Amino acid sequence: MKVYLGVPRGFCAGVVRAIDLVELALNKYGPPVYVKHQIVHNPHVVKDLESKGAITVEEVEEIPIGARVVFSAHGSPPEDFEKARERDLDVVDATCPLVIKVHNEAKKYIGDGRKIILVGHKGHQEVKGTMGQAEMHLVDDREKYKSPDWDLETPVTVLTQTTLSVEDTKRSI
């Protein structure tokens, strides 16, 4: 049997950047550096960073007041940044630039009077972060999706979770 390896392989640039930011924070400030959500969905990388002093948490409230935190590549809703300010946390935002682009597009389209449908996986950190940017409706499974009661004349924009494959997106639209 032949095995073909796709090129390129590995992490996307946004994930590499996020990992680098955690390592830079650890090198510059020393441990502990808290990481809001796994920096990447890879247990080997997470374990390696934790061995260097990174502490992964799921909620901002788990982080001691005044500590340093890196928000993951997946992005976070504005409420997380507000909670971090209230706790006087030193925030390093490692949100992937492509995810930030989706966040900015969501805000722009809502500002233009459009409705937004987000295609993504319910509960995924990126989806949570994106849905926190503006009012939108999530399509996770088109078989279970109930169309919102929107005026048929209202313009609609469809955005997608950046980590979805083309096939996943096609199945949802």
Where are the predicted features?
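The feature marks the mature, well-folded catalytic cores of soluble enzymes
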Residues: 1-173
